[in-house]
Structure formats: C-alpha cells, structure tokens
Amino acid sequence: MEACNCIEPQWPADELLMKYQYISDFFIALAYFSIPLELIYFVKKSAVFPYRWVLVQFGAFIVLCGATHLINLWTFSMHSRTVAIVMTTAKVLTAVVSCATALMLVHIIPDLLSVKTRELFLKNKAAELDREMGLIRTQEETGRHVRMLTHEIRSTLDRHTILKTTLVELGRTLALEECALWMPTRTGLELQLSYTLRQQNPVGYTVPIHLPVINQVFSSNRALKISPNSPVARMRPLAGKHMPGEVVAVRVPLLHLSNFQINDWPELSTKRYALMVLMLPSDSARQWHVHELELVEVVADQVAVALSHAAILEESMRARDLLMEQNIALDLARREAETAIRARNDFLAVMNHEMRTPMHAIIALSSLLQETELTPEQRLMVETILKSSHLLATLINDVLDLSRLEDGSLQLEIATFNLHSVFREVHNLIKPVASVKKLSVSLNLAADLPVQAVGDEKRLMQIVLNVVGNAVKFSKEGSISITAFVAKSESLRDFRAPEFFPAQSDNHFYLRVQVKDSGSGINPQDIPKLFTKFAQTQSLATRNSGGSGLGLAICKRFVNLMEGHIWIESEGPGKGCTAIFIVKLGFAERSNESKLPFLTKVQANHVQTNFPGLKVLVMDDNGSVTKGLLVHLGCDVTTVSSIDEFLHVISQEHKVVFMDVCMPGIDGYELAVRIHEKFTKRHERPVLVALTGNIDKMTKENCMRVGMDGVILKPVSVDKMRSVLSELLEHRVLFEAM
C-alpha cells in the first residue's frame, strides 16, 4: 500500500468518556480552588511563616490551573469564540505564573532543605537537653538523698548511732540487699566486720588488711565495683540465689586527731581507713549507676567527718569525766588540807597558850629573882634561865608567825609610823649585844629617806632586827654597818629574782636596806638554804651559834608580803656577807603624822620604877606569878579565880584589872561587858587589861570590841610589867602589837 499523508478522521464523541472528563475537570477545579483557601487559612494562623509572597504565587498558579480546568468544561461540546478566547487567556496566564513560580522555587528549595536540616539539629539538641535535664534531675535527686543522709548522720554525735544510721539510710535510699562496715583493728593489721544492715549483732569476722581488693579500694577515693566472691563481700549466704547482686566498696577515712587518743580506735600514726561494702539485690538485672556511686562517695566523706566529730566529743566527755574526778579528788584533798591546817592551827593555838603560861611563870619569877641579892654564880644562872626563856618565847612566836604566813591568815597592819625611829630603835637594841662581842655597829640613813612612812612598823622592825641579829650572831670581831636609802629605779631589779617587778609610783617608794658584816661568811651554794624553814648550813659558826632556822624564812615571807625582795651576797667562808632587802612603803600625809589609835612602845625616861599603894585586881590561871610581879612593884594586889568572886570584889578603888580572857570555864569577853554594865561612868571604871597567851589578831579585835583598854601578851617580866603599868596610868590605853 502506498503510504499516504492523511489525517485520521475525528473519532466520534463517546458520551461516557465525555461524562468522566467533565466530572474530573470539575473536581480538579474544585481542588485547585480549595487549596489556596487552605493555604490562606494556615498562613493567617502562622505568625512566623517567612514565605508569604511565595504562597501568593502558588495560590495564583493553582487558581489559574483550576480556572483552566473549569473553563475546559465548556469545550467538550461546541462552543463559541468567546469561550476559546477565555480559555486561551487563562492558559497564557497560567503559563506565565507557573514559569515565575518555577523560577522562584530555584531560590526557595535550598531554604526549605536547610529548614529540614535545622529541624534535625533542633531535634538532636532537644534530645541532648532532655539528657541534660535527666542528669540534672538525677543530680538533684542525689543531692536530696545526700542532704537527707547527712542530716540523719549529723543528727547525733554517738559513733555507733552514726554508723548504724548510715547503713540503714543507704539501704533504704538505694534499695540494698546488704550494707556493711569493716573497721580496722587496734593493731591495724586486720579489718573486722563491725556493722551490717541486716544482722543485729554481726559475728566478728576479720580479714587481712593487705588483701589485693582492699588495697585497690584504699588506694582510690572513688567507689569501686568488686567481685561478689570477695572476702569482704561474703556478708550473707548465697544459698538459693542464682546470680548475686553487684557489689561496690568505698573507703571511709579515719581522720587523724592529733590532740585526742580514742580508746578503741587504731593507732593513727599512718593514714587509716574503714571499708564500706554495699550489695544490690540478688537475682536482679539492676546495676550501679554513676549517680549512685557518687552518692556513696559523698556519704563516705560525710561519715568520716561525723566520726571525727563524734570521736572528739567522746574524748572530750571522757576528759570532762576525768577532770570531774580529778576536781572531786582535789576538792577532797583541799578539804583534808583545810582540816589539817585547822587542826594544826588549833594545836598551835593550844600549845601557844599552854607553853606561854609556864613560860610566863619562868620569866616572871626569874626576873624577880634577878632583882634580889645574888652571888655572881647565882646571877649567872638566873641570867642563863632568862636568856633561854626569851629564846624559847621567840621560837614560839616564830613558829606561829610562819604558820600564819603559810596559810595566808597573817595580814599586814598598815599605819603611819616614824621610819627613822625604827632603825634607831634597832640600833639601840642591838648595840649592847654587839658591844659584848666587841663589834662596832654603824647606822647610815640617807638624807632623802622619808621620816614618816606608811606600812607595817612591827613587821619591818622584825625584819631589820632579825637580819642585824644574824650579822651580830655570826660575827666574832670587826664591824657591822646598817644602811638605808630610797632605791632608785635602776637598782631595783635583781637578776637573781626575775619574778620581782617593782613599779614606780608617786604614792609609794621602795626602801633598800643593806646590812654588811665582817663575820664568818657563807658558801655561795648554801645561800638558798638560808631562806628555807628549819634549814641550817653546815658551817661551824652556824652550828655553834644555834638558832631554829626560822628567822630568814619568816623574813622572806614578810618581805614578799611587802611586795619586795631579799637576798644575801657572800664571797665565801671567812669573807663576811651582805644581806639586802627591798620593801614597798607608802608616802605619809602630813595631816596623818603621829595620829595612831594606840601606842605600841613606851619611852624609857617616862617609866616609873615603883607603884606604891596601886590597887590591882588579878584573875589569871597563873595568878600567884602575876601577883608576885605586881607586889614587887609595890602594888596592892587582889587575886580571884571565878566570875562571881571577881564581880563581888571589884570596886572603884581598883585602878587596874588584869584578867586572862582564856581561862578554863570563864568567858573573859562576857565578863568585860558585865564590868562596863556595872561601871557606867568612864572615870569610875578601872582600867581593863587582857593578859593572854594568844597572839592571834582575833583575840585583840575581840578585846577592843568589848571595850577593854589594853592587851598584854604573856610571858611578862618585871621590866615589861613596869613599862605596862607606867603606860596604863599615863594614857589609860595600851594594846601590845601582835
């Protein structure tokens, strides 16, 4: 067949196909028109969509596409030219818009792809943030558990409660099957199972401390997983268990307490640790998480701190109990010492009274005998008796003074006195004794030495007299010099007494007294012994000179009371020595000079020798001795032995009454009060004088309180009684210094 170039004739229209095309174009147009509406709705709902103008192009493109399909509905049948023009116009517009949209997509698609990439990045970031939030929540949970456990641990300072609470709280928080604490033994060579979670009284298992697993844990500050078959993990029987739970162990430092020694703790010369072992439930798939291990590590550190605090508290309480026991023992010892001191003082007081009473008789009768006609041999014997008696009386006074100095009951009697007179009186007293040994005694008082001073005149004189007396005693020939002056600030300090810190003031001055002799001297190493009571050096001169060894010991204590210092210098035996002391005295006010409430000494030129006809009443347990003294002085003496007899005999004719206030069964103070009641007028009442052997300050104060006119200490010689009566008749008052 020859080929022909012909056009296939138009096939006849099929009604069914036309119908389907018609319906399809309608729905295509409907879809095209609905899509822009949906885009417009969602763009309005989105506030951040960045491609609104692109959607406008898409909307126009879709609308035009829908319009072509809609117009196409009229082209399936015969249609007019107008329909063809509209159809052509719609397709041209659709072509233009579609091309413009296609060109625009070239720029938009990369942005859209990057949006997807950003979406994936944001998803990854969100997942990472979720993980971090989970970690933060885990840390917060761990921190909450740590705070809770720390609060429970710190709620007590009992070591056993701390450890038991730790195991219980860890077991509850971490849902443990078992938790145990291994403590080092006292030797530090083993670990002993001390506390467990499930067992009330764990058996004291021990394991060597040098096991590899223990060394591994002790060498790290982290919680480490260990084998369930490890010796320190075998805390519970595994019978019937298919798979043991995971086990971790952590060290618990035992902090070094340098100032405390805990009784049941190991020796902490090197760093030591306890071991805490924690086991998860058996037959479970549970494993240890990082935050749980961190919780265990923090709790171990908190337990270490709490244990150190508890140990310190235990040792403090133990030290407190020990201190209380020591205080009780000290208090008991103090009371025993006070009882012993009171017993000693009572004994000394009784012995003082009992010794002075016979001493009074010996001295009184010896002094009476001395004034009678005696042969030279008899006079020598009487003088020896008197000297021995006076020495014994001095020894009694020294013992009592030392006793009161040691128990602190002796106090200085501060008053204004003539300082120059003290040295002159000592010089006058010592000069006759020195002249017998052919010793020259010189007194040098500095020009700037105050005449009046404030201090204890009696004790100062006692110090000077004792020091000068020692110089005379230990010197066979040569001279003795007494020098007194106001010490300058540069000469106050003595390198031998670093504890002596004198302080200068406008209200007081420091008196320096130096007594230098050319006597036997002393070894320098023996000088400290001189100030020890009852101690004597071994030199021949000392042994031959006698003495009780109390003089300088008492002087040192008196000097200390006066805030001073005393020392002795000597180059050796045969080279003499110098005694030096410094005492603190006050400057006297001119308005107070010589205004003393009573007199303590009597001028010799005013003493009467006899008192003929002077009526005296005596009540004394040694009444005959006292009466003998008074009768020898010419007095008319009446003696009584009871209160009733005393009150019956006493009258206005009696000028002086001597009464012993400490006679057995007689209260002398009450008797003095009754005498005052009987004689209401002062000029009618006789002079009341207490004659006593008690030298304590209380006796003197009691006598003054009940209105007595004087106190005289036994023993009394004829000369002393003569001076006493002379003073009483002249001033009607005399209180002998005590």
From Swiss-Prot:
Residues 158-307 form the GAF domain. GO terms for biological process: negative regulation of ethylene-activated signaling pathway. Cu cation binds at residues 65, 69. The chain crosses the membrane at residues 23-43, 54-74, 92-112. Its EC number is 2.7.13.3. SMART domains: GAF (SM00065), HATPase_c (SM00387), HisKA (SM00388), REC (SM00448). Belongs to the ethylene receptor family. Homodimer; disulfide-linked. InterPro entries: CheY-like_superfamily, ETR, GAF, GAF-like_dom_sf, HATPase_C_sf, His_kinase_dom, HisK_dim/P_dom, HisK_dim/P_sf. GO terms for cellular component: endoplasmic reticulum membrane. It is found in: Endoplasmic reticulum membrane. Activation probably requires a transfer of a phosphate group between a His in the transmitter domain and an Asp of the receiver domain. Its cofactor is Cu cation. It catalyses: ATP + protein L-histidine = ADP + protein N-phospho-L-histidine. Residues 350-589 form the Histidine kinase domain. This is Ethylene receptor. Residues 612-729 form the Response regulatory domain. Keywords: ATP-binding, Copper, Disulfide bond, Endoplasmic reticulum, Ethylene signaling pathway, Kinase, Membrane, Metal-binding, Nucleotide-binding, Phosphoprotein, Receptor, Transferase, Transmembrane, Transmembrane helix, Two-component regulatory system. Signal peptide: none annotated. CDD domains: HATPase_EvgS-ArcB-TorS-like (cd16922), HisKA (cd00082). The modification Phosphohistidine is found at residue 353. The modification 4-aspartylphosphate is found at residue 660. Binds 1 copper ion per dimer.
